[in-house]
């Protein structure tokens, strides 16, 4: 299977990047005009925390995307080190099914870990900076909704890697674009309904499901489902494959998280100091 990037893929990529960046800018005037200063501050505090949560996925998406590309290009065996040679025109669907099992396992654990941290350490931090959840109405409930939205955003993230790795660049960008447009429409509509900051939190919670649905429909074609339907994957195969992938991913993961913490730790200290 040959993977080609066309001009349409590039154009859709630009559209996707624009809306990923512009979605916050488009919603911002409505947030500033319809929310109190305390709610605006709380919203940006959650966004700051959300940037750290996104680091949980910073190394895994490229890793899964790269290895999915190997598999759909005909690679029959994955290696920890060395050059992987493509010695076949046939896709090893058993290994593809194993990779899907690894992706689900990894992202399930990452998202659950992030949710636990948000509901424990994150809740303590928010309690401190909101003066015991009193500065903003329903602050605790808003934080729980935000934590759940972060959970689903991380859990569904591997679909982007699957589409990219299988050469469906345009389709991946369409899914991302649809999700961001849904976020914009939901945020503005719910703000006009008078839900306040809950509007943004609910939009963040609901919009990823649209992206996930579209991504699923694009990646899991009937042909792919027919090929992997009868594959029996053992837990040992999933663990062994993960060890191969983790060998190089851990280095990038530690480096990225360390760099981010060094550059942005001051924001969290400022939040505690100014609370």
Predicted regions span which residues?
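Hydrophobic alpha-helical transmembrane segments
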Residues: 144, 174-230
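Signature of the first transmembrane helix
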Residues: 5-74, 250-272
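Membrane-embedded alpha-helical segments of multi-pass transporters/permeases
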Residues: 25, 29, 55-59, 115-123, ...
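Residue-level recognition of pore/gate-forming positions within transmembrane alpha-helices
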Residues: 17, 21, 48-51, 150, ...
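Membrane-water interface segments that mark the loop-to-transmembrane alpha-helix transition
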Residues: 8-12, 17, 58, 62-127
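Alpha-helical transmembrane segments of multi-pass membrane proteins
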Residues: 116-128, 132-156, 173
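Interhelical loop/hinge segments that connect adjacent transmembrane helices in multipass membrane
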Residues: 1-6, 215-264
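Membrane-interface junctions at transmembrane-helix termini in multi-pass inner-membrane proteins
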Residues: 150-176, 198
């Amino acid at each position: 299977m040959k993977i080609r990037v066309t001009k349409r893929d590039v154009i859709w990529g630009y559209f996707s990047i624009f809306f990923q960046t512009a979605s916050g800018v488009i919603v911002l005037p409505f947030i500033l005009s319809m929310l109190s200063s305390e709610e605006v501050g709380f919203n940006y505090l959650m966004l700051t925390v959300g940037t750290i949560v996104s680091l949980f996925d910073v190394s895994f998406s490229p890793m899964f995307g790269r290895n999915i590309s190997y598999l759909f290009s005909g690679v029959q065996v994955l290696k920890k080190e060395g050059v992987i040679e493509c010695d076949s025109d046939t896709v090893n669907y058993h290994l593809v099914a194993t990779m899907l099992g690894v992706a689900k396992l990894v992202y399930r654990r990452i998202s659950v870990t992030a949710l636990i941290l948000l509901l424990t350490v994150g809740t303590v931090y928010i309690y401190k900076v909101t003066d015991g959840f009193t500065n903003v109405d329903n602050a605790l409930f808003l934080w729980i909704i935000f934590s759940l939205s972060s959970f689903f955003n991380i859990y569904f993230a591997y679909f982007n890697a699957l589409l990219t790795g299988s050469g469906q660049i345009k389709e991946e960008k369409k899914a991302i674009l649809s999700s961001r447009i849904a976020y914009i429409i939901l945020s503005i509509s719910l703000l006009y309904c008078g839900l306040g900051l809950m509007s943004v939190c609910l939009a963040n919670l609901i919009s990823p499901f649209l992206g996930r649905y579209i991504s699923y429909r694009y990646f899991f074609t009937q042909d792919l489902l027919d090929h992997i339907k009868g594959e029996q994957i053992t837990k040992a195969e999933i663990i062994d494959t993960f060890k191969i992938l983790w060998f190089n991913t851990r280095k990038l993961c530690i480096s990225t998280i360390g760099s981010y913490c060094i550059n942005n730790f001051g924001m969290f200290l400022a939040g505690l100091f100014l609370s």
